[in-house]
UniProtKB/Swiss-Prot annotation:
Keywords, ordered alphabetically: Chondrogenesis, Cleavage on pair of basic residues, Cytokine, Developmental protein, Differentiation, Disulfide bond, Glycoprotein, Growth factor, Osteogenesis, Secreted, Signal
Keyword hit for Repeat: no
Role, per record: Growth factor of the TGF-beta superfamily that plays an essential role in developmental process by inducing and patterning early skeletal formation and by negatively regulating bone density. Antagonizes the ability of certain osteogenic BMPs to induce osteoprogenitor differentiation and ossification. Initiates signaling cascades by associating with type II receptor ACVR2B to activate SMAD2-dependent and SMAD-independent signaling cascades including TAK1 and JNK pathways.
Protein name: Bone morphogenetic protein 3
Highest taxon above the source species: Eukaryota
Source organism (scientific name): Homo sapiens
Keyword Methyltransferase attached: no
Main location: secreted
Amino acid sequence: MAGASRLLFLWLGCFCVSLAQGERPKPPFPELRKAVPGDRTAGGGPDSELQPQDKVSEHMLRLYDRYSTVQAARTPGSLEGGSQPWRPRLLREGNTVRSFRAAAAETLERKGLYIFNLTSLTKSENILSATLYFCIGELGNISLSCPVSGGCSHHAQRKHIQIDLSAWTLKFSRNQSQLLGHLSVDMAKSHRDIMSWLSKDITQLLRKAKENEEFLIGFNITSKGRQLPKRRLPFPEPYILVYANDAAISEPESVVSSLQGHRNFPTGTVPKWDSHIRAALSIERRKKRSTGVLLPLQNNELPGAEYQYKKDEVWEERKPYKTLQAQAPEKSKNKKKQRKGPHRKSQTLQFDEQTLKKARRKQWIEPRNCARRYLKVDFADIGWSEWIISPKSFDAYYCSGACQFPMPKSLKPSNHATIQSIVRAVGVVPGIPEPCCVPEKMSSLSILFFDENKNVVLKVYPNMTVESCACR
């Protein structure tokens, strides 16, 4: 007991000496220190394996996962009782989040100027908010001159640290730069022991730049009379997140115009992602279709025998479906009857009896009335998997079936559909078709993808998944 007290007294003495010398006492068992996101020295966890340049990708992935989790947690009853589709309020009442990576401009007159290319912002996207994220390293390595001769505590010094941000608009055609505004950030507000990430709202600056059609923005990060820590390790580059509301996202073919417009997307040059995202990219798993042939998806025509695909490039390499092969027919006594038919090759596949029974059973089980049917869309099948990060596929569903008279209440027919079905059943007016089975309620889908400048974008597209069907 006396020995333990002596050891405790000795440890307290060393602790006081270290405080007198202005040193921070090192915690015992440093290997048990909790890992902090962005800390490359702490072990464990996928965050410790991320490269500094992947910080923006990690941020966008967390935002996508958060939205997708809330979207998946919706209940079927959440759509009832209202005409507006269910939509979580996570994107600040917007439907678009764009990320922009910075590029250090060492060749310009102002060294340390980080340039952002904002040309991906469209005219239809109204900026709701914008934030600049930047890293300044460890606060403990910042050299400060204390005004008091007696010495200052570490926390007292930290209160005087302030970062200045100078925003510039750049015009490389004229080799000119114009001051856009000044901002300041207090480092103590966002302190982290390992890597200090700071953020600053730049909404007004970007709105002003977009209004003047100035999409090349530069930020110069400095400190007031104090020296920022030297970069012992490469710091993550600054990045900008822009929350916007795209007014044209509900327009016809908005998904095709924004996602299919990446036909010249440079494959193999996407930014690095960690292991659980690389599988979502799968850039090399699909061969490009022939550019000289219009597919049925592009010309809006039904596929037929006149559409000739390159067998070696598409179907043999991809093989999304199991090949159906005709089995050898059993010997029968009706060979003479079979020979009497025309001697041309039949274009109908010959199935065995077991396959036909399964097809009939499946047809009997499926309702003939208007109902929601299952449809899974894989982005690899339509050639979009190279730039869409997540999801790889989604359940779209579709509506199909008859709306015959009398229509049950479960089909939720409109008054016009009810009258139309009666007129068709009576037959007074010839040529009247029956009402159509169409989607009644639909939900949105969030898609994470690369834009033409290889920036990560999150968009929430409305009316992507059928929730219920009705006769109209």
